[in-house]
């Protein structure tokens, strides 16, 4: 049985312990100590990382009553070793875990719902609630949670007796057996938890909701706390400042400026499309009457352009129209046929041109890795009129 020193003092970073066991498993070693400061993964909180006797601790998990440390090198059984946890990693987890407790407590207290899922990832935290949270309520909930930080509310930990526990209102995701560990944050939350936490809510710094979505009939929230929240704000602030600089407006007006740019872009695209359609119509009118098969080469045409132009050529009386546009490598194309034999052309182009694509008997599209000269010869041999 490993003594859990992290429950004595979540702020301690160094300790000494005796190696009870060390076994090689899949190119790593699993080490069991008589006592440890390393918190094992559990309850939604990732494991601590750090070093033991000069070797790296890569992961930590529970196995029965033992705490198992995964290391990159072996440690001698019976030796006394010095251990040190990565404090920056630990404190980040403490900030985010305590922040999650406060926000969950505020939400569950307001809506009478349950927190049915919790995951603390490398980038952010997600919490799953079994009720739908209105989007317009999120600013209030976020501010209420941060109120605990502003008041610097103490984060207390206690181990109530069965009698005390029976009278206590607390959150828990599952039925608990044995001694229950309760984490209490003033009026904001009371929850059964095995994780490490800050002593004062002020140490969390900030709780920020960065996303919300409907999930399994309830709501999934994404949040950041502490240093993560600061880094996210800094990143977004830098982005908005840069957008403002590029558009020559203050950062706070960047969204309006972007909307104006998008509106101008849409107008330009509309004008461009109108010019394209006029161009396609003009080129189609230049096709000699009685032309049954026609091949056209263009540049900068998208799938919609290719199809539209090929359709215009069919409307002019052609039976088959192949329209190609220069791409990064080779050409993209659309081939339409009133004779229902379009697939035959893509099949024939597979071997010589590496044709990739498909479609229906009367319409195919795809890509070829070929030069214009080779494509011209291929279609000329099939009695296509070449147009550019």
What do these predicted regions represent?
Residues 1-388:
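A glycine- and charged-residue-rich anion-binding loop/surface
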């Amino acid at each position: 049985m490993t003594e859990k020193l992290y429950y004595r003092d979540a702020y301690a970073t160094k300790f000494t312990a005796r190696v009870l066991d060390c076994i090689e498993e899949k190119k790593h070693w699993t080490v069991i100590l008589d006592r440890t400061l390393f918190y094992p993964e559990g309850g939604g909180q990732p494991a601590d990382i750090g070093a033991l006797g000069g070797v790296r601790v890569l992961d930590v998990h529970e196995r029965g009553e033992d705490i198992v440390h995964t290391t990159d090198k072996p440690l001698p059984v019976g030796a006394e070793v010095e251990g040190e946890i990565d404090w920056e990693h630990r404190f980040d987890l403490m900030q985010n875990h305590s922040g999650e407790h406060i926000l969950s407590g505020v939400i569950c207290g307001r809506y009478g719902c349950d927190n049915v899922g919790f995951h603390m990832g490398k980038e952010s935290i997600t919490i799953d609630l079994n009720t739908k949270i209105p989007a317009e309520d999120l600013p209030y909930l976020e501010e209420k949670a941060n109120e605990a930080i502003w008041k610097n509310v103490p984060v207390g930990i206690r181990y109530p007796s069965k009698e005390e526990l029976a009278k206590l209102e607390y959150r828990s995701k599952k039925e608990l057996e044995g001694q229950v560990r309760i984490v209490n944050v003033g009026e904001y939350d009371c929850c059964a938890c095995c994780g490490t936490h800050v002593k004062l809510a002020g140490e969390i710094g900030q709780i920020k909701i960065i996303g919300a979505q409907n999930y399994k009939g309830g709501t999934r929230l994404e949040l950041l706390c502490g240093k993560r929240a600061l880094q996210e704000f800094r990143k977004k602030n830098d982005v908005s400042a840069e957008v403002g600089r590029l558009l020559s407006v203050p950062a706070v007006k960047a969204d309006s400026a972007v909307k104006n740019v998008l509106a101008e872009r849409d107008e330009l695209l509309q004008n461009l499309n109108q010019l394209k359609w006029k161009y396609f119509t003009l080129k189609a009118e230049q096709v000699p009457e009685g032309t049954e098969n026609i091949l056209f080469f263009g540049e900068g045409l998208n799938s919609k352009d290719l199809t539209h132009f090929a359709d215009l050529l069919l409307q002019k009386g052609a039976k088959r129209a192949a329209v190609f546009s220069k791409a990064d490598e080779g050409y993209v194309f659309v081939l339409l046929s009133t004779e229902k034999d379009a697939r035959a052309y893509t099949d024939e182009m597979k071997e010589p041109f590496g044709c990739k694509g498909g479609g229906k008997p009367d319409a195919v599209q795809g890509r070829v890795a070929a030069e214009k000269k080779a494509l011209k010869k291929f279609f000329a041999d099939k009695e296509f009129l070449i147009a550019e």
